[in-house]
């Protein structure tokens, strides 16, 4: 037995370790938010420490059952696989998870609860472990059948999960593409809008500089600003491109990592859910059985308690009645004692109250007299002496009255004491009568209680006889019938519980699936919203930087002018302040002289007042202090005399220099005052000594009188209290002896009755316990039989589940390691190729930027007439070619989408077939026991590469001409017409265009196709244009000429049909010498990269021209795609008549939009001119001159004319808004039809 038990104990420990390791492998379904590189470096150490604590140590290896590894080599191979899998799993957990998740804490809490419950269950299950081992050995042949069924169900579940996974992946890919398109469009719209704003600000700065500053200064500043802007734009373009490439690579890597994590987490969650379900089911059955046992025990205990409680209540009621009588007697005696105490206290309290009232009156009168003396003693010294004498007489009279009142109170007190003693004597005489009455009442109550108790006992005996007969009848006939009915109900209830458990389990699984799907969708949405918020924050920060730079530049110039004006004004103001200060100084010097004389006179007067005040304060201090502080008063008086003498000597010397006559008068007055004060002090000292002697004598007499009275009262009170205490003790002793005798008699009777009742109850209890034990034994036998069957089923299921989890763990570890190794090699190749591509692209970008800069410098020297001609010719050709390329691109996109969808379906079917075949081979090897090694999966070929054709020099030369205007902002409003002039009449520009068209374009890697995710759906509707315009120089934003009143549009490139994804100008066959800097999205092939081209389109112009209302009713915006304008489209061609109609309609729309934009720009220029004229008038009115009146009148007239022109232009714009809306709707309808 001991050896078998040790083997079983070791097996249980191994199974627990396997559970721990499996649960830690596949725990935690939540996905952590990705950290940035900086935060990852900081959190790596803390995350590794936390994971080391949570994960099991490497010394405790997982003990798998050796089903297929019977030999030594197989075991070594299995151990090696486990170690490698555990190593890479730990690395993956440390890289992905940085903290303890709520799911981990919840799982740990549930595990601890299960451990506690299992420990309690183990103590009761200990007895039946031997039978369980025998049953398990007998039922081993049944396991293989269950294994087969379990694997079939698991295989169907895996197929369903793979199908669901493929559907989810397709939906996520489609959603990601749509969001990437919207984010890229909104970003390009933001770039276009920002550039137009910057162009308007530069025009405003130029106008102000030309009107205020000198011409040469403005020319120099303009050149310097262009150089700085070009450098800043170049740096920002390179930086932005590198950041976008990094973000795209990171997003692709993160998607692959999330996909691998999803698969692992789903498998782990399925295993964990199955384990929890089995444990809960077993524990519910066991807890129900325990609950039934507890209920029966509680019922028996409640019956016994009721019997004891009833008996105790009967005896307690009798005892309580006797106790209440005794308490009433004690309470009556206590009330009598309280009344005596209250009488004595009341007498003393009235005496003390009268004395305190007298003291309070004396204190109040003293305070009133002192306050009166303080207020009047300065001017009425002699009257104060008379008042003091009168006050002493009045005090003597009041003391006499107090003595009389005290005698009266003492008489009252002695009268009350005498009266209370007489009352006590009367009470003592009547005490025997009271005791006789109380004894008679007590005996009568005892007789009544005895009669009632006898009647109650007779009734109780009769009831007990009836109850015994009824219990016998119940045990013979009703109890067996009730037991059979209860047994039937219990069985039916168990069946209902089983059915309800199955229903709840099915419902719980369904709800968990729904909750998991909803949670997963929310997590994906939350992640996408986070990325969108980050993109929006970056855009907002850049916009704020640009705004702050331009505002600072404007404010610096204004601040410089204001500083110059302020320096002149400050110099003039300083001179005026110096003059005013000199005048004020002269006046103040005169005033100071007069003030000094007044101060001297005021000081003399103040000294006299201070002397009087000091003498008065000294008198008050003498009056307030008593006999104990006389020495201190004399010292203070001597010190005050000395201080006053010194002050008087200083004051006399000072006044002797000024006026000698005043010194003599002051000395005589001081001597006279001293003599008067000495006489007053002598009289006051005599009076105070007499008053103090009288007060001492009166106080001694009063204290002696109080002591004698208190001693007499205490002697009388002691005598009375001792007599009362003696009487009470005698009464208490008699009552206690009587109660003692009664209690003994009651206890004897109660004990006899209790002994009889206890015998009867013990016999009944023995019978009931025997019946209950017999019934419990039968129930336990039935319950144990059912529990054994249920436990055997649970054990079989648990063993099957463990083996399935082991199979899953081995398969996942192998597949994860192979896939990780292949993905690592593919990533390294992709990184190297992307680095090379970025290097070549940077060289080509630099060359393109220099080429475009030279072209713009040449084009600035052309004239307005040639630019307009080139613009008209280019506009016609662009409209013709744009419509054809739009139609071609729509057909090509449809074909490429169908081809991509077919390829994805074929790949999904192939991967599903491979996964099913691999699972089947693994299952055969592990179930049938073959020692063959599993074949490795086919290597995953990396599908994303970056390659370039030709040598390095050819690539750099080919990339030098593709520079776009996306990374370079326009420096002046007239610089965008340069390309049109080159296209029209420059021979060297035509040669440059032919070289550009014949050059090959480099390909772009697939992982750089998708930009950062983000959503800005509402941005397209705020501008009122939907997605009607790709990025490029807008139709609605032609630029003004130098004259502000009649601007001419200089931009020859309309935006409605441009081919670049940023603000660039599309090349055509006729005007092809324009230089383009293409983005990396144009380097990809036409088949696989079509979705990325679609996502790179911007879509918000400001205004569109008028279109007929019949065409504006077609709904649904769709963006124009740039690939049709530069690539080769495959699809059907339209007829010549349809193309001509479409071109004519687009030309009309373009003309309406150009007219609307020119009127808008005229309005802006007029508003700027009006604001500058108002500013000039304000500056001129601050410092008016006689010659500036005529100029102000002329400027005022010009301002009125400009305001009239502004009103007219505003009305025209208001009238043109409806036609432009119709044009926008028409363009959207065309785009939807062609898309």
From Swiss-Prot:
Gene Ontology molecular functions: phosphatase binding
Functional description taken from the UniProt entry: Plays a role in the dynamic structure of centrosome-associated contractile fibers via its interaction with CETN2.
Signal peptide: none
Stretches for region Interaction with CETN2: 104-123, 468-487, 634-653
UniProt KW keywords: Cytoplasm, Cytoskeleton, Repeat
Region listing for Disordered, in residue ranges: 1010-1075
First and last residues of every HAT repeat: 131-163, 165-194, 263-295, 327-361, 392-424, 1141-1173
Comment on protein domains: CETN2-binding regions contains a conserved Trp residue in their C-terminal ends, which seems critical for interaction with CETN2.
Annotated protein name in UniProt: Protein SFI1 homolog
Gene encoding the protein: SFI1
Organism listed in the record: Callithrix jacchus (White-tufted-ear marmoset)
Family that this chain belongs to: Belongs to the SFI1 family.
């Amino acid at each position: 037995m001991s050896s078998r038990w040790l083997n079983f104990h070791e097996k249980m420990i191994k199974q627990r370790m396997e559970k721990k390791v499996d649960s830690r492998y596949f725990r935690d379904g939540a996905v952590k938010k990705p950290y940035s590189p900086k935060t990852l470096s900081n959190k790596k150490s803390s995350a590794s420490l936390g994971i080391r604590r949570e994960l099991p140590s490497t010394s405790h290896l997982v003990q798998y059952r050796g089903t297929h590894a019977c030999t030594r080599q197989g075991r070594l191979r299995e151990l090696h696989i486990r170690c490698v899998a555990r190593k890479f799993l730990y690395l993956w957990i440390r890289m992905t998870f940085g903290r303890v998740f709520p799911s981990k804490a919840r799982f740990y809490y549930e595990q601890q609860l299960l451990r506690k419950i299992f420990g309690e269950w183990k103590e009761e299950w200990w007895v039946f472990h031997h039978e369980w081992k025998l049953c398990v050995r007998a039922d081993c042949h049944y396991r293989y059948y269950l294994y087969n069924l379990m694997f079939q169900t698991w295989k169907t579940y895996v197929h369903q999960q793979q199908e669901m996974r493929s559907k989810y992946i397709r939906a996520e890919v489609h959603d990601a593409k749509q969001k990437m398109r919207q984010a890229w469009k909104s970003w390009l719209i933001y770039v276009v809008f920002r550039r137009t704003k910057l162009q308007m600000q530069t025009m405003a700065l130029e106008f102000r500089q030309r009107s205020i500053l000198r011409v040469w200064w403005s020319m120099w500043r303009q050149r310097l600003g262009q150089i700085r802007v070009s450098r800043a734009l170049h740096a920002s373009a390179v930086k932005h491109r590198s950041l976008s490439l990094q973000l795209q690579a990171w997003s692709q890597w993160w998607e692959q990592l999330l996909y691998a994590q999803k698969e692992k987490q789903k498998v782990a969650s399925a295993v964990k859910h199955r384990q929890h379900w089995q444990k809960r089911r077993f524990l519910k059955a066991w807890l129900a059985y325990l609950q039934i046992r507890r209920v029966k025990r509680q019922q028996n205990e409640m019956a016994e308690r009721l019997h004891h409680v009833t008996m105790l209540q009967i005896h307690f009621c009798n005892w309580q009645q006797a106790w209440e009588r005794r308490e009433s007697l004690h309470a009556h005696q206590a009330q009598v004692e309280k009344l005596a105490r209250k009488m004595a206290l009341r007498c003393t309290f009235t005496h003390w109250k009268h004395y305190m009232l007298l003291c309070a009156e004396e204190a109040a009168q003293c305070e009133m007299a002192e306050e009166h003396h303080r207020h009047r003693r300065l001017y009425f010294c002699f009257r104060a002496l008379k008042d003091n004498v009168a006050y002493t007489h009045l005090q003597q009279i009041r003391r006499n009255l107090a003595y009389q009142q005290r005698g009266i109170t003492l008489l009252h007190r002695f009268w009350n004491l005498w009266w209370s003693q007489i009352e006590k004597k009367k009470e003592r005489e009547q005490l025997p009568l009271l005791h006789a009455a109380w004894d008679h009442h007590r005996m009568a109550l005892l007789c009544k209680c005895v009669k009632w108790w006898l009647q109650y006992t007779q009734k109780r005996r009769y009831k007990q006889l009836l109850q015994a007969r009824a219990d016998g009848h119940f045990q013979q006939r009703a109890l067996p019938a009730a037991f059979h009915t209860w047994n039937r109900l219990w069985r039916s209830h168990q069946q209902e519980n089983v059915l309800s458990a199955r229903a709840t389990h099915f419902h719980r699984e369904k709800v968990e699936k729904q909750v998991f799907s909803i949670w997963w969708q929310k997590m994906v949405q939350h992640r996408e919203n986070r990325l969108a918020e980050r993109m929006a924050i970056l855009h907002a920060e850049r916009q704020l930087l640009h705004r702050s730079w331009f505002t600072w530049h404007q404010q610096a110039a204004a601040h410089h002018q204001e500083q110059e004006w302020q320096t002149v004004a400050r110099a003039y103001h300083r001179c005026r302040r110096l003059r005013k200060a000199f005048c004020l100084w002269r006046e103040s010097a005169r005033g100071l002289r007069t003030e000094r004389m007044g101060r001297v006179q005021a000081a003399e007067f103040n000294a006299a007042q201070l002397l009087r005040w000091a003498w008065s304060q000294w008198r008050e201090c003498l009056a307030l202090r008593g006999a104990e502080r006389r020495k201190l008063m004399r010292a203070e008086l001597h010190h005050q005399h000395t201080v006053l003498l010194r002050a008087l000597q200083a004051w006399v010397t000072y006044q002797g220099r000024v006026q000698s006559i005043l010194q003599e008068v002051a000395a005589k007055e001081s001597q006279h005052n001293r003599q008067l004060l000495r006489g007053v002090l002598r009289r006051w000292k005599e009076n105070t000594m007499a008053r103090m002697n009288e007060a001492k004598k009166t106080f001694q007499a009063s204290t002696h009188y109080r002591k004698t009275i208190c001693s007499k009262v205490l002697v009388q009170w002691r005598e009375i209290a001792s007599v009362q205490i003696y009487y009470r003790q005698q009464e208490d002793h008699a009552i206690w002896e009587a109660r003692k005798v009664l209690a003994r008699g009651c206890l004897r009777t109660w004990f006899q009755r209790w002994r009889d009742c206890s015998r009867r109850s013990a016999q009944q209890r023995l019978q009931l316990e025997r019946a209950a034990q017999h019934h419990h034994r039968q129930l336990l036998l039935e319950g144990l039989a059912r529990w054994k069957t249920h436990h055997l089923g649970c054990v079989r299921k648990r063993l099957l589940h463990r083996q399935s989890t082991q199979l899953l763990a081995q398969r996942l570890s192998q597949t994860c390691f192979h896939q990780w190794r292949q993905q690592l090699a593919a990533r390294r190749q992709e990184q190297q190729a992307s680095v090379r591509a970025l290097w070549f692209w940077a060289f080509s970008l630099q060359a393109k930027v220099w080429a475009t800069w030279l072209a713009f410098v040449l084009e600035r020297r052309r004239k307005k007439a040639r630019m307009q001609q080139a613009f008209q010719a280019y506009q016609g050709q662009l409209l013709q070619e744009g419509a054809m390329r739009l139609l071609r691109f729509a057909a090509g996109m449809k074909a490429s989408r169908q081809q991509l969808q077919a390829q994805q379906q074929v790949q999904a079917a192939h991967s599903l077939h491979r996964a099913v075949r691999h699972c089947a081979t693994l299952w055969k090897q592990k179930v049938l026991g073959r020692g063959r090694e599993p074949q490795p999966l086919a290597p995953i070929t990396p599908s994303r590469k970056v390659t370039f054709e030709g040598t390095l020099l050819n690539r750099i030369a080919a990339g030098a001409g593709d520079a776009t205007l996306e990374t370079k902002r326009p420096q002046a409003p007239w610089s965008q017409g340069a390309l049109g002039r080159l296209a029209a009449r420059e021979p060297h520009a035509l040669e440059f265009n032919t070289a550009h068209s014949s050059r090959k374009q480099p390909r772009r890697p697939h992982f750089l196709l998708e930009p950062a995710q983000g959503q800005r759906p509402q941005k397209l509707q705020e501008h009122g244009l939907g997605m009607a315009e790709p990025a490029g120089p807008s139709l609605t934003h032609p630029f003004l000429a130098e004259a502000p009143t009649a601007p001419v549009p200089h931009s020859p490139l309309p935006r409605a049909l441009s081919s670049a994804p940023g603000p660039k100008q599309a090349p055509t066959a006729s005007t092809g010498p324009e230089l383009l800097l293409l983005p990396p999205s144009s380097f990809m092939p036409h088949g696989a990269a079509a979705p990325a081209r679609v996502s790179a389109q911007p879509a918000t112009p400001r205004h569109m021209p008028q279109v007929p209302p019949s065409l504006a009713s077609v709904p649904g915006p769709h963006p124009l795609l740039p690939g049709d304008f530069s690539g080769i489209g495959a699809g059907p061609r339209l007829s010549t008549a349809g193309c001509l109609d479409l071109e004519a309609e687009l030309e009309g729309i373009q003309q309406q939009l150009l007219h609307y934009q020119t009127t808008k720009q005229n309005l802006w220029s007029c508003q700027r001119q009006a604001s500058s004229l108002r500013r000039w008038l304000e500056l001129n009115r601050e410092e008016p001159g006689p010659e500036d009146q005529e100029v102000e009148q002329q400027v005022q007239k010009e301002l009125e004319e400009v305001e009239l022109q502004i009103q007219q232009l505003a009305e025209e714009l208001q009238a043109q808004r409806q036609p432009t809306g119709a044009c926008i709707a028409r363009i959207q309808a065309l785009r939807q039809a062609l898309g």
